[in-house]
């Protein structure tokens, strides 16, 4: 028994080394003074300073931050409302729509990316043809040209972020006392007041977790962004890929370290919130059981 336990521990250690040793090496060499990736020449921060003078990186960072924040906000609103709608359905319709909701998460990113790209190209072509038709008929030409860009990138991120918000909010809905909203309305609150002042506060942990997950997924996405951003827009993941294709620069180590740190901090926040939520729920159930036993 002890021998099997020891082998299991060694196996787990080897797995963790295999997973995290490359990331650790990347982080260490992001502070290496030499461009040589095999020789340590001393500690430096100038690769991080160089990022501040790289216009392509700065623009990609602005695009990444803008898309991630906007996508997280919109997906949080849509996902919360959709979760409430799913929860209000009967069992079979709910199971059907939950299955549909799970498709973007289980589907390969490249399939989702190509599908969204074809959809956006189709609609942009229709809109451009409509603008051309209106111009031919009226002589008034609108100075617009619909194409893949920031808007299509944002719509794509909203599309794959929303299911994660739904899955984060649904557990809170299952724990919600259905009588709270009715009790608030019996006491004189309008349905909207009951929703905003009674229901939403109960859903806040799931909503916040869903928003953080959505933001993390957007910051980290490459494949779907690559197909839906077009030629004029690039996020950080795409910029790192472009730099790596040209040559492996120490700046890639620096920007990858920054991305890893951002994602890791957000994941820690999510896990801490989940643990605290579970502890609070356990305390609440324990208090109810104690009161019931009296």
Where in this protein do the model-derived segments appear?
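Membrane-interfacial helix termini and adjacent extracytoplasmic/periplasmic loops
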Residues: 36-41, 45-46, 50, 110-158, ...
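Short membrane-interfacial helix/loop motifs at transmembrane-helix boundaries
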Residues: 21-55, 226-231, 283
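Transmembrane-helix boundary motif in ABC transporter permease subunits
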Residues: 1-5, 70-101, 114, 118-121, ...
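Periplasmic/extracellular loop-to-transmembrane helix junction in inner-membrane transport proteins
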Residues: 4, 35-71, 245-246
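Hydrophobic alpha-helical transmembrane segments of multipass integral membrane proteins
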Residues: 58, 62, 66-78, 82, ...
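Transmembrane alpha-helices
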Residues: 11, 16-23, 103, 107, ...
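C-terminal transmembrane helix and the adjacent membrane-cytosol boundary/short C-terminal tail
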Residues: 2-10, 86, 134, 170-185, ...
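Interhelical loop and adjacent transmembrane-helix boundary motif
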Residues: 2-4, 48-56, 219-276
């Amino acid at each position: 028994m002890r021998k099997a336990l020891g082998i299991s521990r060694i196996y787990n250690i080897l797995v963790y080394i295999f997973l995290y040793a490359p990331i650790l090496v990347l982080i260490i060499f992001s502070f290496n003074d030499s461009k040589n990736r095999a020789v340590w020449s001393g500690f430096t921060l100038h690769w991080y300073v160089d990022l501040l003078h790289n216009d392509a990186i700065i623009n990609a960072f602005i695009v990444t931050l803008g898309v991630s924040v906007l996508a997280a906000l919109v997906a949080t609103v849509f996902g919360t409302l959709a979760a409430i709608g799913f929860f209000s359905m009967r069992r079979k319709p709910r199971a059907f729509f939950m299955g549909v909701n799970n498709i973007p998460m289980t589907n390969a990113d490249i399939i989702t990316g190509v599908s969204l790209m074809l959809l956006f190209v189709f609609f942009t072509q229709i809109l451009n043809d409509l603008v051309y038709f209106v111009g031919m008929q009226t002589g008034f030409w609108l100075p617009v040209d619909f194409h893949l860009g920031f808007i299509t990138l944002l719509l794509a991120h909203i599309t794959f972020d929303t299911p994660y918000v739904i899955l984060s909010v649904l557990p809170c809905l299952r724990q919600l006392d259905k009588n709270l909203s009715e009790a608030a309305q019996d006491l004189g609150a309008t349905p909207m007041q009951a929703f905003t002042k009674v229901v939403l506060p109960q859903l806040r942990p799931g909503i916040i977790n869903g928003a953080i997950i959505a933001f993390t997924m957007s910051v980290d996405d490459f494949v779907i962004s690559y197909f839906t951003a077009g030629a004029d827009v690039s996020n950080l993941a795409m910029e790192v890929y472009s730099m790596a294709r040209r040559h492996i620069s120490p700046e890639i180590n620096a920007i990858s370290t920054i991305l890893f740190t951002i994602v890791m901090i957000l994941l820690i926040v999510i896990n801490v919130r989940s643990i605290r939520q579970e502890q609070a729920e356990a305390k609440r159930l324990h208090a109810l059981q104690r009161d019931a036993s009296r």
